[in-house]
Every structure is written in structure tokens, then in C-alpha cells.
Amino acid sequence: MEFSTQTTASLHLIKTSALAVGVYADGVLSPAAEQIDHASNGAIRAVTKTEFRGRAGATLVLRNLAGISAQRVVLVGLGKQEEYSVRAHSGAEQAFAAYLVAAQLTEGVSTLAALPIENSTMRDRARAAAIAAGQATYHYDATFGKPDREALPKLKKITQIIERAEAAQTQQGLREGAAIANGMALTRTLGNLPGNICTPTYLGETARKLAREFKTLIKVEVLDRKQVEALGMGSFVSVARGSAEPLRFVVLRYNGKPATARRTRGAAGPVVLVGKGITFDAGGISIKPAATMDEMKYDMCGAASVLGTFRALAELAPALEVVGLIAACENLPSGTANKPGDVVTSMSGQTIEILNTDAEGRLVLCDALTYAERFKPSAVIDIATLTGACVVALGGVNTGLFSKDDALASALLEAGRQTQDPAWRMPLDDAYQEQLRSNFADIANIGGPQAGAVTAACFLSRFTQAYPWAHLDIAGTAWRGGKDKGATGRPVPLLMQYLLNQAA
């Protein structure tokens, strides 16, 4: 989809299929709505007195208004004026884009990004608008026998009305938002695909497709079981052993720096993103309940977010180095699967007692985190649907953020704030490490019923002593259940904004 900008002082002269103007709660009109209301002899105030009160996300369409060139004026509810934020703006833009899709329109014009918001820039609002439009236009039909929207016209263009002085800032924000939205779309589709299609091999092939599409920016290596065993990744291999699907260890390298500016001795290393890629998690011998087991196809959303971030990176081509690592396999019960009480040796040399085979994400991540050392990274961020305990603690609003590095944690929190993809910093005190004590190995893979999200992060921290590290537990934010079941594309916005901030 194309995003563009236009500067005009005469909104009533804009020729478009649909023009969006904002209305705050209790019928308070935005400046754009005031202008259209004046040009149409009070058409907007006539409806705000009765049927449209500006509830956040609500829309009302006024057609063929006298004195207005736009075919439709779409009133978009903004909520209370004193509470209007970038998050509310994102919701308003998404509501407008959703209307354009539902009405089968190919283009529209929005005045919403021009509304001032405290502690935000035009770039922030433009980025939010493009991400919101991408979310509204995303549609999954990969596994339907007949794509249900094949014949419908597609939304091709949204134009933002802005001040001339803000053109460069707006265009930059729209470009960033469009790339992030494309990365989120890839992440969502990978998450939504069933486990019999999106296998470890499929993830490897998706990485290779990215490398072919962006061959000057992305290089990919896909390792098989024999190569992984040669590296000593005994913990990762032990999880994969229970399934007939072959494991894959995917290494992506992005370098947007000019050849003359490539890394020299002593320069900062790359940022490394590590994604958990359990393409289906039945729990292994410690099998999960059947009722919601279908949702365990989403256990690879950490890996999907790495791939989505790399897509967005390649589209924007910022001048930095990023490595992506994906440890992909299935976790199934079988005669060759891990058993409770088994002891395995990780790539780091530390031995692990497996007390619960359904705590497998940390078993694949620990070897990937050890592998990350070879890149001498400036920071390592792992992304994983790791614990149900994090869902209990934070629900579906905030991603759980664990790190002992204050600077890294603050940078990630700020990136989440900038993109309305929030995270919440959780404790990582050494006192929790005692729960992971084992009588038969260096460490146990679970720490009992208390503080499950924290002890999972504590487990991972044992393998991250060589570099600054943060862990994102996305178990509550990577997908939604219920009637709107589906992957969300988070935390691609947070990750991309963090990387863009590093390149700035």
C-alpha cells in the first residue's frame, strides 16, 4: 500500500472517495472537522448533537455533503480530548483504514495525523498511522480453499494532510511505519499458518526467500541436525529428538553499512536477535491439555518476529549490523523424546536436568544464546513465547522484559513507548536462582510453581554472561485467542524502533 502527503488549507476542495476528520468525545470538533462543518453549513454539528458523540474508534459516514468535494466525510471518534494520545491516534487511523477496506474503496485521505499530541512528533504520528493501516488491511487466507477476498478491490493509497514544514518528518514516519507493517504482516502469517505447513524447514526456507529478495543486505545460513550436533547443542537437539520433523538452526546476517564503514577492530559488534521457533508444542512427555493445544502453533512467534524484523530492516536499510538466530523444532511426545529426569549437556558445557519437558523453549534458546557469543555482540535480545506465568502477570497488554542491563532495558522500553508496543520490566534478582538448583545437574529447567516467568528468565541468564542481554517474554502479546484468534505481529514494532534508534 502507498502512503503519501498533501498540503492544503482548503479541505473542502479535496477530491477523494473518503476524507477522515476527527471528533472528540461530547462532540468537540477537531480543526479539520470545524472546517468541513463550516463549508457544509453545519452538517457535522447536526449529527454530533444526536447520533455521533466521538467515542474512541467509532465512525460515521456522511455522503455527498453540499460544498464538499469528497464523496464521503468519515467522522472518526477520538475519545476525550484531554486523554488523546499516540495510542488513541493509532486506533483512530486503524478505524478509518478498516472502514476503507469494508467499503471496498481503493484510496482515502486522512487529517488525523495533523492533530497535535503531547510528547509526540509528526514522525511518531505518521509512523503510527502507517502501522495502523497495515494492521487494518491485514487479511489471512493462506489455508482457505478459495481465497475469500480475491475479487475485492484492494486499498492502494492513504494520503495524510499535513503542514508543509512537516513534510520530511511525515514522509520518514510513513516510510518507517509501512516497513514495520510489512514485517508485522510476515510475522502474523507465519504465526497463523498451521504446524503441518510452518515447520522448521519452512522457517528456514522463509529466511532464504528474504535473502534472495534482499540479496545485497541479508545473508542466510541454515544448519541441519548434523551441523548442530557438531556444535555441541545437546540441549536443543534433545527437544527436537521427539519429532520426525528435522530441526533447523537459522542464522541471518543483515548489514546496512556501506562497505567503507564496515566494522573495524574494537568497534561495537552487531545486535543479535534470538527467536524461539517451536513450530508446534504439544509439551512432550509432559503433555499439554487438549482443549487449547491448537494454539501451540504460535510457539514459534519469537522466530516469526525475528523474520518480520529482518524484512522491515531490509526495506528501510538503516546503517547497522544485525544478526538473527532461530532455533526451530517441534516438541512432541514419542519414544525418543526427552523424559522428566533426563540430563542433557548444553553448548555452554552446563548440564541441565529436565524436570518438565514442557519447559522446552529455554532448552533451545540456551544453545542459541551460547552460539551468539561468536559475534561479539553489542547486545543480545531473545524473543520467546516462553511462559504462561507471564500471561498471568501481564495479560495481553505488556510484553515481559527481563534484563540486568539498565541501559538496554531503558532503550527497549522507550522503543515500545514510541510504537505503542509496550513492555514492562520484570525482576531478575539473583535470589530467584536458588529455585533452579538441581541435585543431579548444574541447573534444573524449571523452578517450581512460584515466579515462573522470572525463573525462566533466570535460567536463560546463566547462558548470557558474555554480553548485554534482554529477554522478551511474548507469551501474552504474540497472539490473541477467542473469536479474534490470530497472531498480532508483536513485538516487531518495538524491535524495529529499538534498532532504528541505535542507527540514529
Curated annotation (Swiss-Prot):
Instruction: From the UniProt record, report the name of the gene that encodes this protein.
Output: pepA
Q: Which PROSITE patterns match?
A: CYTOSOL_AP
Q: What are the entry keywords? A: Aminopeptidase, Cytoplasm, Hydrolase, Manganese, Metal-binding, Protease
Residues at which Mn(2+) 1 binds: 281, 358, 360
Q: Which named protein is this?
A: Probable cytosol aminopeptidase
GO biological process assignments: proteolysis
How is its cofactor bound, per UniProt?
Binds 2 manganese ions per subunit.
Kindly list the cofactors needed: Mn(2+)
In the UniProt entry, which residues are flagged as the active site? 288, 362
At the highest ranks, the source species' classification is: Bacteria, Pseudomonadati, Pseudomonadota, Betaproteobacteria, Burkholderiales
Q: Which Pfam families match?
A: Peptidase_M17 (PF00883), Peptidase_M17_N (PF02789)
Q: Which SUPFAM superfamilies match?
A: Macro domain-like (SSF52949), Zn-dependent exopeptidases (SSF53187)
Subcellular location, principal: cytoplasm
Which reaction(s) does the protein catalyse, per the Swiss-Prot or TrEMBL entry? Release of an N-terminal amino acid, Xaa-|-Yaa-, in which Xaa is preferably Leu, but may be other amino acids including Pro although not Arg or Lys, and Yaa may be Pro. Amino acid amides and methyl esters are also readily hydrolyzed, but rates on arylamides are exceedingly low; Release of an N-terminal amino acid, preferentially leucine, but not glutamic or aspartic acids
Q: Where does Mn(2+) 2 bind?
A: 276, 281, 299, 360
Molecular function per GO: manganese ion binding; metalloaminopeptidase activity
Q: GO cellular component terms?
A: cytoplasm
Respond yes or no to whether keyword Protease is given for this record.
yes
Superkingdom of origin organism: Bacteria
